[in-house]
Amino acid sequence: MPCQHDCEIVISHLMKLKLISCEIFYREFNAVIARSPHLVDAEFLPKGLHDIGTARMRDRIQAAIDGIKDFSYDAILIGYGLCNNGVVGLTSRDRPLIIPRAHDCITLFLGSKERYLDYFQNNPGVYFETTGWIERGTASGELSQLTVGSKLKMQQSFEDLVRRYGEDNARHLWEQIGNPEKQYRKITFIEMGIEPNDSFETAAREKAETRNWKFEKLAGSIGLFQRLVNGGWNDAEFLLVPPGCRVAATYDNGIIGIEKA
C-alpha cells in the first residue's frame, strides 16, 4: 500500500540528529560529524549484523531505532545501504528516518550509486577493503555464533567437512559455500582521505599478494557521508521515511521507497 509522503522537516540553523550506523563507517562518520553544522549523536552497530541474515539484521537495527528515548531529535539518520534488504521494513513511530539510496556500503564509499554501478559492472570479482573492514571486519562474541557461516558449520577446514559429510559431499559443499574467496580475483582498497597513515593500504596490498590477486587503490568520496549529516537531503540521494511508514525495496534506480507500516 502506498504511503503518503506528507512529512516535511523544517531545516533550522541547528538540528539535533541521531545517527545509527554500521561500525564499518566509524572513521568516516566521525570525520564528517566534526564538520556538520548540526548536533549529531552517533550509535554504531557491529559489522557482524550483515552476516546473521536479513531478518535478524533488520530486527537489530529496528531495536536501536525503538530504543531512542530522547524525543528532541529532529530526525534519525540510518548509516546503511539496502544491504541485502537488511533495512527493508524499518520504521519509526514519531520521527522521520533518512536513509541513503545505496545498494550497499560500497555506494557510500564511492560517493554515488551511479559510480558504484559503473565500477561494479567493469570490475567483476573484486574484494573491497577500507579502514573499517580491515580493523572491524571480523564478527566476535554473540554475533560470531549467529553468522550464517557458523550456522552452516562452514567455518572449518576441508578435512573437517570430509569427516562430517564424506569426500564427495564435502567437495561439493566447499566449492559452493565453504570457500567464499573463490569468486574474487582482485582487492580494491578504497582510500577515503581519513586514513592516519598507509598501514591500511599496506595490509590490503599484502592480503592481495598472499592470494596472488591483483591490487588496486581507488579514491573514494566522503561526499555522501557529509551530506547525510549536513541535512538538506535531496531526493535523488536520500529517502525520507515519514513516521508511520516503512522502508520498501523498489528494485529500480531509486533502490528504496516507502510504504504504509
Segments (PLM) and residue ranges:
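Extended, basic/helix-rich recognition subdomains
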Residues: 167-261
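Gly/Ser/Thr-rich loops at beta-strand to alpha-helix junctions
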Residues: 20-27, 76-88, 103-105, 133-136, ...
